[in-house]
């Protein structure tokens, strides 16, 4: 089962927490759609900033966005001009009439964040870099920054082949069935001249909960 399911969803409430934190009764579906639109808008608007994830918290008519970015300077801009412009655009296009607060957090090691690694590999594929070279670069740079293991999967018409196939490259351990393992996951689709290529990245950063069996 661990091989099939999203590793972050499988670990929610164990070693992972929710990226949307709020409670709603009748407006539940509306809030889910609004969260989806918020994330899509932020990622499209700030695609050069290296957005790892967007956390959303709600209280009454207030929404707080926490944006994790590899290049926070692009998001903030000179004297905070860019972030004010972003706030205004979100208020106009996505969350009309709601109070909005935005926090920016820097991602210290983007080479160890699965979503950013996947985006980097996908970007190389779109620039016609050989898929094996792109995968090996991603793996070697992550291992250099001290992760316990990484696995990258590319699937589609690799190298312009007639038949779609799936290839993967792994280094270290990536225990997808171990629930106490901190496994980061990222997925991106690369749009190439031959069609779309899916890029999945799994990064194992170590075990969060101690193994109680060793004590007994």
Swiss-Prot record:
Domain KH type-2: 38-108
GO-annotated biological processes: translation
Xref: CDD domains: KH-II_30S_S3 (cd02412)
Residue stretches in coiled coil: none
An annotated GO cellular component: cytosolic small ribosomal subunit
Entry superkingdom: Bacteria
Keyword Hydrolase: no
InterPro entries membership: KH_dom, KH_dom-like_a/b, KH_dom_type_2, KH_sf_prok-type, Ribosomal_S3_C_sf, Ribosomal_uS3_bac-typ, Ribosomal_uS3_C, Ribosomal_uS3_CS
HAMAP family, sorted: Ribosomal_uS3_B
Annotated family: Belongs to the universal ribosomal protein uS3 family.
Assembly information from the UniProt record: Part of the 30S ribosomal subunit. Forms a tight complex with proteins S10 and S14.
Alphabetical list of NCBIfam families matching this protein: rpsC_bact (TIGR01009)
Record protein name field: Small ribosomal subunit protein uS3
Source organism of this protein record: Desulfosudis oleivorans (strain DSM 6200 / JCM 39069 / Hxd3) (Desulfococcus oleovorans)
Primary gene name: rpsC
